[in-house]
A protein has these predicted regions:
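Terminal helices and disordered tails flanking the catalytic cores of nucleotide-processing hydrolases
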Residues: 262, 272-427
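Sequence-structural signature of the catalytic-core scaffold of metal-dependent phosphohydrolases
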Residues: 1-86, 94-319
Length: 427
Protein backbone atom coordinates (compact mmCIF):
# COMPACT_ATOMS: atom_id res chain seq x y z
CA UNK A 1 0.00 0.00 0.00
CA UNK A 2 1.19 3.51 -0.86
CA UNK A 3 -0.27 6.56 0.90
CA UNK A 4 0.40 10.14 -0.13
CA UNK A 5 0.90 12.38 2.88
CA UNK A 6 0.97 16.19 2.76
CA UNK A 7 3.97 16.25 5.12
CA UNK A 8 6.18 13.33 4.06
CA UNK A 9 5.06 12.67 0.49
CA UNK A 10 4.65 9.05 -0.65
CA UNK A 11 4.72 6.52 2.19
CA UNK A 12 5.14 2.82 1.45
CA UNK A 13 3.48 0.50 3.96
CA UNK A 14 4.68 -3.09 4.22
CA UNK A 15 2.05 -5.89 3.93
CA UNK A 16 1.47 -6.23 7.69
CA UNK A 17 1.19 -2.46 8.16
CA UNK A 18 -1.28 -2.39 5.26
CA UNK A 19 -3.32 -5.15 6.88
CA UNK A 20 -3.43 -3.12 10.12
CA UNK A 21 -4.53 0.07 8.36
CA UNK A 22 -7.34 -1.81 6.62
CA UNK A 23 -9.14 -2.70 9.85
CA UNK A 24 -11.98 -0.84 11.59
CA UNK A 25 -9.75 -0.59 14.67
CA UNK A 26 -7.27 1.60 12.80
CA UNK A 27 -9.74 3.37 10.51
CA UNK A 28 -11.54 4.81 13.54
CA UNK A 29 -8.51 7.09 14.02
CA UNK A 30 -9.84 9.14 11.10
CA UNK A 31 -12.64 10.23 13.44
CA UNK A 32 -10.42 11.48 16.28
CA UNK A 33 -8.88 14.92 15.86
CA UNK A 34 -5.14 14.95 16.44
CA UNK A 35 -5.35 18.14 18.48
CA UNK A 36 -8.59 17.62 20.41
CA UNK A 37 -10.87 20.69 20.34
CA UNK A 38 -8.33 22.87 18.53
CA UNK A 39 -10.37 22.79 15.30
CA UNK A 40 -13.17 24.68 17.09
CA UNK A 41 -10.80 27.66 17.43
CA UNK A 42 -8.33 27.11 14.57
CA UNK A 43 -10.57 25.78 11.74
CA UNK A 44 -7.72 24.33 9.66
CA UNK A 45 -6.55 22.09 12.52
CA UNK A 46 -8.76 19.34 11.17
CA UNK A 47 -6.14 16.62 10.86
CA UNK A 48 -6.69 13.31 12.60
CA UNK A 49 -4.82 10.64 14.54
CA UNK A 50 -4.88 8.60 11.31
CA UNK A 51 -2.46 10.85 9.40
CA UNK A 52 -0.21 11.29 12.41
CA UNK A 53 0.01 7.53 12.97
CA UNK A 54 0.94 6.86 9.35
CA UNK A 55 3.51 9.67 9.52
CA UNK A 56 5.03 8.22 12.69
CA UNK A 57 5.24 4.81 10.99
CA UNK A 58 7.16 6.41 8.14
CA UNK A 59 9.64 8.25 10.38
CA UNK A 60 10.16 5.28 12.73
CA UNK A 61 10.95 3.04 9.77
CA UNK A 62 13.20 5.69 8.27
CA UNK A 63 15.18 6.20 11.49
CA UNK A 64 15.89 2.54 12.19
CA UNK A 65 16.74 1.90 8.53
CA UNK A 66 19.26 4.76 8.61
CA UNK A 67 20.83 3.39 11.80
CA UNK A 68 20.93 -0.12 10.33
CA UNK A 69 22.73 0.99 7.16
CA UNK A 70 25.16 3.18 9.09
CA UNK A 71 25.93 0.55 11.75
CA UNK A 72 25.66 -3.00 10.36
CA UNK A 73 27.42 -4.30 13.49
CA UNK A 74 24.13 -3.77 15.38
CA UNK A 75 22.65 -6.65 13.34
CA UNK A 76 19.27 -5.03 12.85
CA UNK A 77 17.13 -7.45 10.84
CA UNK A 78 14.32 -6.59 8.44
CA UNK A 79 11.89 -8.08 10.98
CA UNK A 80 13.07 -5.66 13.69
CA UNK A 81 12.70 -2.75 11.25
CA UNK A 82 9.18 -3.91 10.52
CA UNK A 83 8.23 -4.18 14.21
CA UNK A 84 9.56 -0.70 14.98
CA UNK A 85 7.50 0.69 12.11
CA UNK A 86 4.36 -1.09 13.32
CA UNK A 87 4.93 0.24 16.84
CA UNK A 88 5.00 3.74 15.34
CA UNK A 89 1.86 3.01 13.33
CA UNK A 90 -0.08 1.77 16.35
CA UNK A 91 1.30 4.00 19.11
CA UNK A 92 -1.88 6.12 19.25
CA UNK A 93 -4.39 3.37 18.56
CA UNK A 94 -5.78 3.69 22.09
CA UNK A 95 -6.69 7.36 21.85
CA UNK A 96 -10.36 8.00 22.51
CA UNK A 97 -12.52 11.03 21.81
CA UNK A 98 -10.70 14.37 21.91
CA UNK A 99 -7.37 12.61 22.44
CA UNK A 100 -5.52 13.76 25.58
CA UNK A 101 -8.53 15.66 26.91
CA UNK A 102 -10.30 12.37 27.67
CA UNK A 103 -7.34 10.98 29.62
CA UNK A 104 -5.77 14.02 31.24
CA UNK A 105 -8.92 15.78 32.40
CA UNK A 106 -12.04 13.62 32.15
CA UNK A 107 -10.61 10.37 33.56
CA UNK A 108 -8.57 12.35 36.08
CA UNK A 109 -11.82 13.89 37.32
CA UNK A 110 -13.11 10.37 38.01
CA UNK A 111 -10.18 9.17 40.12
CA UNK A 112 -12.52 8.55 43.05
CA UNK A 113 -14.53 6.12 40.96
CA UNK A 114 -14.24 2.79 42.80
CA UNK A 115 -13.75 0.62 39.74
CA UNK A 116 -11.37 3.02 38.01
CA UNK A 117 -9.05 2.80 40.99
CA UNK A 118 -8.37 -0.82 40.08
CA UNK A 119 -8.04 -0.07 36.36
CA UNK A 120 -5.07 2.28 36.30
CA UNK A 121 -3.24 0.13 33.75
CA UNK A 122 -6.13 0.60 31.31
CA UNK A 123 -6.52 4.33 31.79
CA UNK A 124 -3.64 5.64 29.69
CA UNK A 125 -3.84 5.58 25.93
CA UNK A 126 -0.53 3.70 25.51
CA UNK A 127 -1.95 0.72 27.40
CA UNK A 128 -5.23 0.92 25.51
CA UNK A 129 -3.21 0.90 22.28
CA UNK A 130 -1.72 -2.44 23.29
CA UNK A 131 -5.18 -3.78 24.19
CA UNK A 132 -6.56 -2.76 20.80
CA UNK A 133 -3.60 -4.20 18.88
CA UNK A 134 -4.17 -7.58 20.50
CA UNK A 135 -7.90 -7.30 19.82
CA UNK A 136 -7.21 -6.39 16.18
CA UNK A 137 -4.80 -9.29 15.68
CA UNK A 138 -7.30 -11.76 17.13
CA UNK A 139 -10.40 -10.47 15.35
CA UNK A 140 -8.97 -9.57 11.95
CA UNK A 141 -6.22 -12.20 11.77
CA UNK A 142 -3.35 -9.75 11.35
CA UNK A 143 -0.23 -11.97 11.01
CA UNK A 144 1.67 -11.04 14.19
CA UNK A 145 2.68 -13.61 16.81
CA UNK A 146 2.91 -13.19 20.60
CA UNK A 147 6.65 -12.52 20.59
CA UNK A 148 6.26 -9.79 17.98
CA UNK A 149 3.31 -8.26 19.85
CA UNK A 150 5.41 -8.19 23.01
CA UNK A 151 8.11 -6.13 21.26
CA UNK A 152 5.56 -3.78 19.68
CA UNK A 153 3.78 -3.21 22.99
CA UNK A 154 6.98 -2.50 24.91
CA UNK A 155 8.09 0.00 22.25
CA UNK A 156 4.76 1.86 22.39
CA UNK A 157 4.87 2.11 26.17
CA UNK A 158 8.64 1.93 26.78
CA UNK A 159 9.45 -0.75 29.32
CA UNK A 160 13.17 -1.41 29.44
CA UNK A 161 12.57 -3.74 32.39
CA UNK A 162 10.79 -6.09 29.96
CA UNK A 163 13.68 -6.14 27.49
CA UNK A 164 15.16 -9.32 28.99
CA UNK A 165 11.92 -11.16 28.21
CA UNK A 166 12.26 -10.54 24.49
CA UNK A 167 13.47 -13.34 22.26
CA UNK A 168 17.26 -13.04 21.75
CA UNK A 169 16.82 -12.28 18.04
CA UNK A 170 15.06 -9.02 18.95
CA UNK A 171 17.60 -7.89 21.57
CA UNK A 172 19.65 -5.48 19.46
CA UNK A 173 20.09 -3.02 22.34
CA UNK A 174 18.05 -0.94 24.77
CA UNK A 175 18.52 2.08 22.52
CA UNK A 176 15.58 0.75 20.53
CA UNK A 177 13.23 2.17 23.20
CA UNK A 178 14.29 5.69 22.19
CA UNK A 179 12.70 5.75 18.72
CA UNK A 180 8.91 5.93 19.18
CA UNK A 181 8.46 7.49 22.62
CA UNK A 182 11.78 8.44 24.16
CA UNK A 183 11.73 8.42 27.99
CA UNK A 184 15.41 9.42 28.14
CA UNK A 185 15.47 12.82 26.44
CA UNK A 186 12.15 13.25 24.59
CA UNK A 187 13.66 13.13 21.08
CA UNK A 188 11.45 10.72 19.16
CA UNK A 189 9.66 10.33 15.85
CA UNK A 190 6.23 10.79 17.43
CA UNK A 191 7.27 14.33 18.34
CA UNK A 192 8.89 14.95 14.95
CA UNK A 193 5.64 14.21 13.17
CA UNK A 194 3.13 15.99 15.36
CA UNK A 195 5.20 19.18 15.68
CA UNK A 196 5.57 19.53 11.92
CA UNK A 197 1.98 18.44 11.21
CA UNK A 198 0.39 20.70 13.83
CA UNK A 199 2.37 23.81 12.89
CA UNK A 200 1.39 23.40 9.25
CA UNK A 201 -2.26 22.76 10.16
CA UNK A 202 -2.61 26.00 12.12
CA UNK A 203 -0.61 28.04 9.62
CA UNK A 204 2.49 28.80 11.67
CA UNK A 205 5.49 29.53 9.46
CA UNK A 206 8.30 27.90 11.39
CA UNK A 207 9.82 24.46 11.60
CA UNK A 208 12.92 22.41 12.28
CA UNK A 209 15.03 20.02 10.24
CA UNK A 210 13.90 16.63 11.54
CA UNK A 211 15.44 14.91 8.50
CA UNK A 212 18.89 16.07 9.56
CA UNK A 213 18.31 14.82 13.11
CA UNK A 214 17.32 11.39 11.78
CA UNK A 215 20.25 11.34 9.35
CA UNK A 216 22.76 12.03 12.14
CA UNK A 217 21.30 9.56 14.66
CA UNK A 218 23.92 7.04 15.80
CA UNK A 219 23.98 4.38 18.52
CA UNK A 220 26.86 4.83 20.98
CA UNK A 221 27.07 3.10 24.36
CA UNK A 222 23.52 1.76 23.94
CA UNK A 223 22.00 5.22 23.43
CA UNK A 224 20.84 7.05 20.32
CA UNK A 225 23.21 10.00 20.05
CA UNK A 226 23.27 13.00 17.74
CA UNK A 227 26.04 15.06 16.19
CA UNK A 228 26.74 18.41 17.83
CA UNK A 229 25.95 20.03 14.49
CA UNK A 230 22.32 18.99 15.13
CA UNK A 231 22.11 20.72 18.49
CA UNK A 232 20.48 23.88 17.13
CA UNK A 233 17.94 21.84 15.14
CA UNK A 234 17.12 19.87 18.28
CA UNK A 235 16.86 23.01 20.39
CA UNK A 236 14.57 24.52 17.76
CA UNK A 237 12.38 21.40 17.98
CA UNK A 238 11.94 21.90 21.73
CA UNK A 239 11.30 25.62 21.22
CA UNK A 240 8.55 24.84 18.71
CA UNK A 241 7.00 22.47 21.21
CA UNK A 242 7.02 25.27 23.78
CA UNK A 243 5.55 27.79 21.36
CA UNK A 244 2.76 25.44 20.26
CA UNK A 245 1.80 24.77 23.85
CA UNK A 246 1.95 28.44 24.80
CA UNK A 247 0.34 29.97 21.74
CA UNK A 248 -1.91 27.25 20.32
CA UNK A 249 -2.70 24.23 22.51
CA UNK A 250 -3.33 26.43 25.56
CA UNK A 251 -4.97 29.33 23.73
CA UNK A 252 -7.53 30.97 26.03
CA UNK A 253 -10.49 29.98 23.82
CA UNK A 254 -9.22 26.42 23.39
CA UNK A 255 -9.03 25.96 27.16
CA UNK A 256 -12.47 27.57 27.58
CA UNK A 257 -14.03 25.05 25.20
CA UNK A 258 -12.15 22.23 26.92
CA UNK A 259 -13.75 23.26 30.22
CA UNK A 260 -17.19 22.84 28.62
CA UNK A 261 -16.25 19.56 26.91
CA UNK A 262 -15.15 18.13 30.27
CA UNK A 263 -18.47 19.23 31.79
CA UNK A 264 -20.21 17.57 28.85
CA UNK A 265 -18.30 14.31 29.30
CA UNK A 266 -19.12 14.24 33.01
CA UNK A 267 -22.83 14.66 32.22
CA UNK A 268 -22.64 11.90 29.59
CA UNK A 269 -20.84 9.72 32.14
CA UNK A 270 -23.85 10.02 34.45
CA UNK A 271 -26.08 8.80 31.63
CA UNK A 272 -23.93 6.16 29.92
CA UNK A 273 -21.03 5.32 32.26
CA UNK A 274 -18.56 5.81 29.40
CA UNK A 275 -15.53 5.47 31.68
CA UNK A 276 -16.26 1.74 31.72
CA UNK A 277 -15.96 1.54 27.94
CA UNK A 278 -12.19 1.25 28.40
CA UNK A 279 -12.77 -2.30 29.70
CA UNK A 280 -14.17 -3.55 26.38
CA UNK A 281 -12.25 -3.13 23.10
CA UNK A 282 -15.48 -3.05 21.06
CA UNK A 283 -17.04 -0.37 23.28
CA UNK A 284 -13.75 1.53 23.29
CA UNK A 285 -13.96 1.84 19.53
CA UNK A 286 -17.24 3.76 19.83
CA UNK A 287 -15.51 6.63 21.61
CA UNK A 288 -14.65 8.91 18.70
CA UNK A 289 -15.16 12.69 18.63
CA UNK A 290 -18.65 12.58 17.10
CA UNK A 291 -19.89 10.40 19.99
CA UNK A 292 -20.68 13.39 22.21
CA UNK A 293 -22.57 15.57 19.73
CA UNK A 294 -25.64 13.57 18.75
CA UNK A 295 -28.48 11.45 20.09
CA UNK A 296 -28.81 13.02 23.54
CA UNK A 297 -32.15 13.79 25.19
CA UNK A 298 -30.77 14.90 28.56
CA UNK A 299 -31.44 18.64 29.02
CA UNK A 300 -28.10 19.34 30.76
CA UNK A 301 -26.17 17.67 27.94
CA UNK A 302 -28.09 19.52 25.22
CA UNK A 303 -27.56 22.83 27.03
CA UNK A 304 -23.77 22.44 27.08
CA UNK A 305 -23.70 21.45 23.39
CA UNK A 306 -25.79 24.53 22.60
CA UNK A 307 -23.38 26.76 24.54
CA UNK A 308 -20.44 25.41 22.54
CA UNK A 309 -22.24 25.77 19.20
CA UNK A 310 -23.36 29.33 20.01
CA UNK A 311 -19.91 30.26 21.30
CA UNK A 312 -21.22 30.98 24.79
CA UNK A 313 -17.97 29.80 26.26
CA UNK A 314 -16.26 30.74 29.56
CA UNK A 315 -14.40 34.05 29.41
CA UNK A 316 -10.86 34.55 30.69
CA UNK A 317 -10.90 37.23 33.40
CA UNK A 318 -7.50 36.75 35.01
CA UNK A 319 -4.13 35.26 34.12
CA UNK A 320 -0.83 35.06 35.93
CA UNK A 321 2.42 33.68 34.49
CA UNK A 322 5.48 32.93 36.58
CA UNK A 323 8.68 30.91 36.71
CA UNK A 324 7.29 29.42 39.93
CA UNK A 325 3.85 28.03 40.87
CA UNK A 326 1.45 31.00 40.87
CA UNK A 327 0.00 32.13 44.17
CA UNK A 328 -3.70 32.95 44.25
CA UNK A 329 -6.11 33.63 47.12
CA UNK A 330 -9.20 31.64 46.15
CA UNK A 331 -10.71 32.08 49.61
CA UNK A 332 -10.88 35.81 48.95
CA UNK A 333 -12.51 35.17 45.56
CA UNK A 334 -15.13 32.96 47.24
CA UNK A 335 -16.15 35.88 49.41
CA UNK A 336 -17.40 37.66 46.29
CA UNK A 337 -18.46 34.82 43.98
CA UNK A 338 -19.97 31.35 44.25
CA UNK A 339 -17.51 28.58 43.35
CA UNK A 340 -19.69 27.39 40.46
CA UNK A 341 -19.46 30.79 38.73
CA UNK A 342 -15.74 30.53 37.98
CA UNK A 343 -13.15 27.95 37.01
CA UNK A 344 -9.50 28.07 38.08
CA UNK A 345 -7.03 26.45 35.72
CA UNK A 346 -3.37 25.76 36.46
CA UNK A 347 -0.90 24.35 33.94
CA UNK A 348 2.77 24.35 32.99
CA UNK A 349 4.34 25.14 29.64
CA UNK A 350 7.92 24.27 28.82
CA UNK A 351 10.43 22.93 26.34
CA UNK A 352 9.99 19.45 27.85
CA UNK A 353 8.18 18.06 30.88
CA UNK A 354 10.71 19.39 33.39
CA UNK A 355 12.52 22.64 34.16
CA UNK A 356 16.00 21.85 32.83
CA UNK A 357 17.62 22.64 29.51
CA UNK A 358 16.56 19.71 27.27
CA UNK A 359 20.02 19.58 25.69
CA UNK A 360 21.49 18.51 29.03
CA UNK A 361 19.88 15.08 28.70
CA UNK A 362 21.11 14.43 25.17
CA UNK A 363 24.36 12.69 24.31
CA UNK A 364 26.14 14.34 21.38
CA UNK A 365 29.04 13.00 19.35
CA UNK A 366 31.75 14.52 17.18
CA UNK A 367 30.83 14.03 13.53
CA UNK A 368 34.50 13.79 12.52
CA UNK A 369 35.70 11.08 14.91
CA UNK A 370 32.43 9.60 16.18
CA UNK A 371 33.39 10.11 19.83
CA UNK A 372 31.05 11.38 22.55
CA UNK A 373 31.44 15.09 23.35
CA UNK A 374 31.75 16.26 26.94
CA UNK A 375 28.76 17.98 28.55
CA UNK A 376 30.70 21.21 29.03
CA UNK A 377 31.22 21.63 25.30
CA UNK A 378 27.54 20.99 24.66
CA UNK A 379 26.45 23.58 27.24
CA UNK A 380 28.73 26.21 25.74
CA UNK A 381 27.55 25.90 22.14
CA UNK A 382 25.50 29.09 22.58
CA UNK A 383 25.69 31.78 25.26
CA UNK A 384 22.27 33.15 24.32
CA UNK A 385 20.18 30.12 25.26
CA UNK A 386 18.04 30.77 28.30
CA UNK A 387 18.52 28.81 31.51
CA UNK A 388 14.77 28.87 32.19
CA UNK A 389 12.70 26.32 30.34
CA UNK A 390 9.32 26.18 32.08
CA UNK A 391 6.53 28.62 32.94
CA UNK A 392 3.60 28.27 35.33
CA UNK A 393 0.18 29.59 34.34
CA UNK A 394 -2.85 30.37 36.46
CA UNK A 395 -6.11 31.38 34.80
CA UNK A 396 -9.55 32.24 36.12
CA UNK A 397 -12.49 31.82 33.76
CA UNK A 398 -15.93 33.33 34.30
CA UNK A 399 -18.49 30.52 33.92
CA UNK A 400 -21.58 32.72 34.33
CA UNK A 401 -21.44 35.32 31.58
CA UNK A 402 -24.05 37.51 33.29
CA UNK A 403 -21.38 38.16 35.95
CA UNK A 404 -18.61 39.00 33.48
CA UNK A 405 -18.55 42.72 34.28
CA UNK A 406 -18.39 42.04 38.02
CA UNK A 407 -15.49 39.61 37.53
CA UNK A 408 -13.64 42.16 35.41
CA UNK A 409 -14.15 44.81 38.09
CA UNK A 410 -12.94 42.43 40.80
CA UNK A 411 -9.72 41.56 38.98
CA UNK A 412 -9.10 45.16 37.93
CA UNK A 413 -9.17 46.14 41.61
CA UNK A 414 -6.98 43.15 42.45
CA UNK A 415 -4.45 44.18 39.80
CA UNK A 416 -4.35 47.79 41.05
CA UNK A 417 -3.94 46.61 44.63
CA UNK A 418 -1.14 44.26 43.60
CA UNK A 419 0.67 46.96 41.61
CA UNK A 420 0.36 49.41 44.49
CA UNK A 421 1.81 46.86 46.88
CA UNK A 422 4.77 46.22 44.56
CA UNK A 423 5.47 49.97 44.24
CA UNK A 424 5.46 50.35 48.03
CA UNK A 425 7.90 47.46 48.34
CA UNK A 426 10.23 49.15 45.86
CA UNK A 427 10.14 52.36 47.91
Amino acid sequence: MIIYDNIHGYINLDPIASAIVDTPVFQRLRNIHQTGVLYLVFPTANHSRFEHSVGTYHLATQMIEKISKKQPELKITSEIIQLVGIAGLCHDLGHLLFSHLFDDYFLESLTNHNELKTLTKNVYHENRSITLINHMVDKYEVPLNKDQLKVIGDLINPKESEYGKWKPKYQVGRWIFQIISNPLNSIDVDKFDYLVRDTQAVGLKFGFNYSRIIEDAKVIENKICYSLQCSEDIYQMFFIRYRLHRQIYNHKAVKAIEILIIKLLIEIEKELNISQYILDPEKMMELVDSFIWHGHTNISIKKIIEEINQRKIPKLVYQDVSLHPCEFDEDKLKQSFDANTYHILRFKVGYVGGKSNPLNKITFYNLKNGKIISENKVRSFSLLITQKHQEYFLRVYCMNLSLLDKFNEYFEELSQSKNGSEENNED
